[in-house]
Design a protein with these regions (language model features):
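Conserved non-catalytic scaffold segment of RNase H-like nuclease domains
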Residues: 2-109
Length: 109
């Protein structure tokens, strides 16, 4: 059995080019995850691993300029990236079973 670890998660999101074009049905969907980044820390908060994957956007495929400026993630970085289901499965496998997921804010939950 693997040792307990803390997983510190950071997500990056793309947004529609125009807020008026945000998906509203069947639910309000104003952004899409384009990167999962995480660090694994042991019980003494020492870094023991890292995870990073870009995610090819499905709903907002055109990069918002503000997002590019903030994250430095460009459309060409995402072209060959996995879509969310594959990236999520890879992340969950990397996390393992005995971990505590930590974030710095509500946008990463």
């Amino acid at each position: 059995m693997a040792d307990f670890s803390y997983i510190v998660l950071d997500l990056e999101w793309n947004q529609p080019l125009n807020p008026d074009s945000a998906i509203r049905e069947p639910f309000f969907f104003d952004s899409e995850i384009i990167e999962i980044g995480a660090l694994r820390l042991d019980e003494r908060f020492r870094e023991t691993g890292s995870f990073k994957t870009f995610i090819r956007p499905r709903f907002y495929p055109h990069m918002n300029g503000d997002v590019v400026q903030l994250t430095k993630i460009r459309a060409q970085d995402l072209e060959k990236a996995p879509e969310f289901p594959r990236a999520y499965a890879d992340f969950m496998e990397w996390c393992g079973e005995d971990c505590c997921l930590c974030t710095w804010g509500p946008d990463d939950i």
